[in-house]
Amino acid sequence: MSGEDGSEPRVFSVLRGEALRTRSGPFGEVGTLCSAGGIEVAWVSKHGEQVDPDWFRPDQVDVLLVVQGQLKVEFESAARPDRVLAAGDVLVLPAGCRCRAYRWPRDAAEATIFLAACPAGQDGR
């Protein structure tokens, strides 16, 4: 969902403006919104990037909230079914589960944006 003039969605400019720091890579863009009291809240944007071949493994519980678009979360373990989340959906990732997330469907026109809350300093690789 882009602006009427073809510009990026307003949510992007708001999130970028509020971010303490941002970083971009081949798997998306991440901006840290808050890091206090041992908790870090970040926004993640996925728009046509590659799917990360590595698995993410949170050391502690992570909470994801989809703001825009759809997000597919694949789990390494066949015991956990893959999930497709839409705007407004929340997913709790248990500590130690191995997963990866990407925009769904892969050829969607709009970016997927989600918020992630986790313990500060967690890398998950």
Regions found by a protein language model. Give the residues of each.
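A short, N-terminal "cap"/entry segment at the start of jelly-roll beta-barrel domains
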Residues: 1-55
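A short beta-strand-loop-beta hairpin characteristic of the jelly-roll/cupin
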Residues: 57-87
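Conserved hydrophobic/aromatic beta-strand scaffold that supports enzyme active sites
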Residues: 41-45, 63, 82, 90-92, ...
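Residue-level recognition of conserved beta-strand positions in structured domain cores
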Residues: 43, 68, 75-77, 103, ...
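Histidine-centered metal-chelating micro-motifs
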Residues: 51, 72, 81, 89-91, ...
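Short secondary-structure boundary/capping segments
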Residues: 33, 55, 82-83, 91
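A structure-centric signal for secondary-structure junctions around beta-strands
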Residues: 38-40, 60, 109-112
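Ligand-binding loop in jelly-roll beta-barrel domains
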Residues: 86-87, 95-124
